[in-house]
């Protein structure tokens, strides 16, 4: 009886022995697959530099506000295109007016990043009030004062004394327009300021003087040589002697209150570059020494 029981037991034992390799093999396979799943999880949790770190932030768009003398309009409008092409994130916005008007606006808190004046008086006033960055202030350009008359008119002026034979003569308001101040100094040096008072027409800026002469509203007017060069409706009758008035200098300065100091300095340096000087020269300005 005991012998009959041994056979089934041996058969069962043998079957169990044969099943062991299969079980171990299954565990090995599971173990081998685990790292593959873990690697995929690691990739998802830690994205590659290409998908995260290399994504650049969008460049901030900046608007620079430039208060500039009206006589700089044409040259700065051309340079605006050049500068913005080099600095795609910067947009230049110009406020053109008489230098004295711009000075008052800035003193009263009007926003501005740069100031370009047609006279040192206006710039010096802002420097004295500590509104200009002393390290970013320089004389940029020089100009000439001329007397213009209509191209197709019959007005003839050979010297300053001939002005007493004319009708109305336009000049910028001396208190706020540098060209008007230079005209006043020139007329005073020739003892003509008082005699011509009944004939003087005061304007808000030098561009208005030019317009009055172009349209024949006045017989003559004092403007900058650069303004006269931009119009075919006027011609230069006289050039004021340099010694008859203060030097005509165009200072430039960065405001201390600018909220974009990096971009403002970039524009400041660009306007001093050889490329900018060539453009200014094309409009009749002379780069300051």
PLM region spans:
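Signal peptide-proximal N-terminal region
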Residues: 81-94
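Conserved beta-strand core positions
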Residues: 64, 90-92, 145
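C-terminal motif of bacterial Sec signal peptides marking the signal peptidase cleavage site
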Residues: 19-23
């Amino acid at each position: 009886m005991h012998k009959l029981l041994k056979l089934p037991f041996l058969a069962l034992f043998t079957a169990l022995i044969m099943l062991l390799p299969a079980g171990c093999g299954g565990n090995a396979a599971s173990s081998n697959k685990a790292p593959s799943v873990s690697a995929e999880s690691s990739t998802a949790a830690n994205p590659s530099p290409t998908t995260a770190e290399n994504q650049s932030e969008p460049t901030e768009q900046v608007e620079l506000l430039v208060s500039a003398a009206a006589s700089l309009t044409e040259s700065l409008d051309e340079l605006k295109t050049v500068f913005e092409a080099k600095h795609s994130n910067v947009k230049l916005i110009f406020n053109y007016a008489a230098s004295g008007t711009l000075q008052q606006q800035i003193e009263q808190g009007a926003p501005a990043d740069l100031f370009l004046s047609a006279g040192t008086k206006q710039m010096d006033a802002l420097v004295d009030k500590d509104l200009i960055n002393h390290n970013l202030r320089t004389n940029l350009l020089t100009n000439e004062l001329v007397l213009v008359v209509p191209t197709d008119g019959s007005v003839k002026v050979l010297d300053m004394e001939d002005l007493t034979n004319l009708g109305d003569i336009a000049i910028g308001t001396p208190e706020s327009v540098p060209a008007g101040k230079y005209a006043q100094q020139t007329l005073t040096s020739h003892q003509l300021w008082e005699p011509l008072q009944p004939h003087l027409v005061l304007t808000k800026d030098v561009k208005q003087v030019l317009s009055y002469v172009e349209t024949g509203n006045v017989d003559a007017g004092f403007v900058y040589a650069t303004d006269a060069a931009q119009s075919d409706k006027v011609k230069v009758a006289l050039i004021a002697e340099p010694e008859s008035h203060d030097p005509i200098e165009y200072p430039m300065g960065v405001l201390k209150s600018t909220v974009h100091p990096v971009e403002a300095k970039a524009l400041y340096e660009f306007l001093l570059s050889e490329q900018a000087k060539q453009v200014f020269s094309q409009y009749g300005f002379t780069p300051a020494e």
